[in-house]
């Protein structure tokens, strides 16, 4: 399996949202509607995608598959924790 390179961009509109594309400034396969929501992409880095590499919240195989299939991968922030809901669940009587 070949090592791929990808360019990583941060959204100017959405916090903790990143766009991975196969080459620097190659947004040719990214839908226009997504680019409008994403805002002006802010270049972060060029990165090799190695199968033995780990990325915080991105599964490497999913990243490779999406880049190959769709020409981009959109990383969204994790859902916010609802601390009140967790607290109430912990306080509720257990049967």
From Swiss-Prot:
Coiled coil regions, renumbered to chain: none
Short name of one Pfam family: YcgL
Superkingdom assignment: Bacteria
PROSITE patterns for this protein: YCGL (PS51648)
Every YcgL domain range: 4-88
InterPro entries: YcgL-like_sf, YcgL_dom
UniProt xrefs under HAMAP family: UPF0745 (MF_01866)
PANTHER family linked: PROTEIN YCGL
Protein name, as recorded: YcgL domain-containing protein Patl_2802
Source organism per UniProt: Pseudoalteromonas atlantica (strain T6c / ATCC BAA-1087)
């Amino acid at each position: 399996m070949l090592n791929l390179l990808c360019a990583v961009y941060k959204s100017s509109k959405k916090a903790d949202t990143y766009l991975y594309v196969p080459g620097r400034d190659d947004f040719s396969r990214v839908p226009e509607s997504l680019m409008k929501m994403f805002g002006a992409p802010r270049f972060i880095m060029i990165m090799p995608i190695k199968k033995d590499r780990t990325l915080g919240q991105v599964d490497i195989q999913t990243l490779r598959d999406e880049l190959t299939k769709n020409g981009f991968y959109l990383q969204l922030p994790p859902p916010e924790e609802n601390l009140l809901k967790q607290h109430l669940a912990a306080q509720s009587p257990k049967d």
